[in-house]
Swiss-Prot record:
HAMAP family: Ribosomal_bL35
PANTHER family: 54S RIBOSOMAL PROTEIN BL35M (PTHR33343), LARGE RIBOSOMAL SUBUNIT PROTEIN BL35M (PTHR33343:SF1)
Entry-linked SUPFAM superfamilies: L35p-like
Domain of life: Bacteria
GO biological process: translation
Gene name of the record: rpmI
Lineage: Bacteria, Pseudomonadati, Pseudomonadota, Gammaproteobacteria, Thiotrichales
Alphabetical UniProt keywords: Ribonucleoprotein, Ribosomal protein
Keyword Amino-acid biosynthesis among UniProt keywords: no
Skewed-composition ranges (Polar residues): 54-65
Name of the featured protein: Large ribosomal subunit protein bL35
GO cellular component terms given for this protein: cytosolic large ribosomal subunit
Organism expressing this protein natively: Francisella tularensis subsp. holarctica (strain LVS)
Length: 65
């Protein structure tokens, strides 16, 4: 049976956690941030957990993660 391909777009955006979940960067941080408050930018700085509903599709997209 051939190897399964990893979706490279998903591999760039998501990282697997130790317990089997996935984390991703917060959205709305790329540009046009001058109108945001410092508090808003600070809260967007970290990583977010992916919802459990979406983890099954991520497992299919990244079979070796």
């Amino acid at each position: 049976m051939p190897k399964l391909k990893t979706k490279s777009g998903a591999a760039k955006r998501f990282k697997k956690t130790g317990k089997g979940g996935f984390k991703h960067r917060c959205a709305n941080r790329a540009h046009i941030n001058t109108k945001m408050t410092t508090k808003r930018k600070r809260h967007l700085r970290g990583m977010n957990q992916v919802a459990k509903v979406d983890t099954t599709s991520l497992v299919q997209q990244m079979p070796y993660a």
